C-alpha cells in the first residue's frame, strides 16, 4: 500500500507540473495575475519579494476571502500546517505559506483547491457566484469547514450556486474517507451542541465538487497546538481528515 501511494504521489507531482504549465499557456497568466491581493499572508513584500511568486507546480490550498461579515480569515495557522503535514506524509511538494484568493481574481483558475471557513455569514456577489460555479464545473474543488455559525448562510450560498443540485450527506464509503487514510467520517474536534460530525457535498455525476464539514471543526484541529490546547489525538484526527481531503482534491481517488 505504501509503495502504491508513493507511486501515486509521483504521478500527482508530474500531473501538477503539467497542469500548471497548461494553465499558464491556456490563460496567459503572469505571476502578478496569480498573486492574490495583498500577497502571501504574513510575508513582507519588501523583504521577501520572491515569496510573491506562487509555484504552480506545488500543491496548495487557497483560502477564499468572501463578504458578508463572516470571519473568512478564521483558523489562520490551519492551512500552512495542513500543507506542511501533507508534504511530510504524502511526499507531494506543497506550498509553504497560506494563499488568499478572491473569487473575482483573474488567477482563480490557478487554484484548483479552494477553502472556506468562518463563524458567520457568507455572502457572494452575483459575479462571484458565476465565477465559483465555472471554477467548480471546470474541475475545481471547494472544501468548506463550518467553524460553528456559517451553516445557514453556506447552505443558502450552495442553493444559489447550484439550484439544480442538492447538498447531500456523503456516505462513509466515499473515496474522500479512503483517499490516503481509512477514516470513519469527519472527526469531532470541538463540541458545540451534541450533534454528530457530518460531511456534506455537491456531486457532479461521480465527482465530488464541494465537501462541507459540519459540526466537526477540522480547521480548529489543524491550528497550532497552543491555540486551542487540543489533545494530540484530536489534532491527529484533524490532520488525517485534512490530508484525505487534500489528497482527494488532487487525485479524485
Regions of interest found by a model, annotated:
Residues 1-8:
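N-terminal secretory signal peptides that target proteins for export/translocation
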Residues 11-24:
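Bacterial N-terminal signal peptides
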Residues 29-113, 119-120, 209, 217-253:
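Aromatic-Pro/Gly-enriched surface loop or interdomain linker
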Residues 36-41, 151-226, 234-243:
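An acidic, glycine-rich "communication" segment
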Residues 61, 113-152:
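Short alpha-beta junction capping motif
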Residues 66-70, 119-123, 142, 147-152, ...:
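Solvent-exposed loop/turn segments at secondary-structure junctions
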Residues 76-83, 129, 133, 151, ...:
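Extracytoplasmic/secreted envelope proteins and their assembly/folding machinery
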Residues 92-102, 144-147, 165-173:
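Surface-exposed patches in mature extracellular/periplasmic domains of secreted proteins
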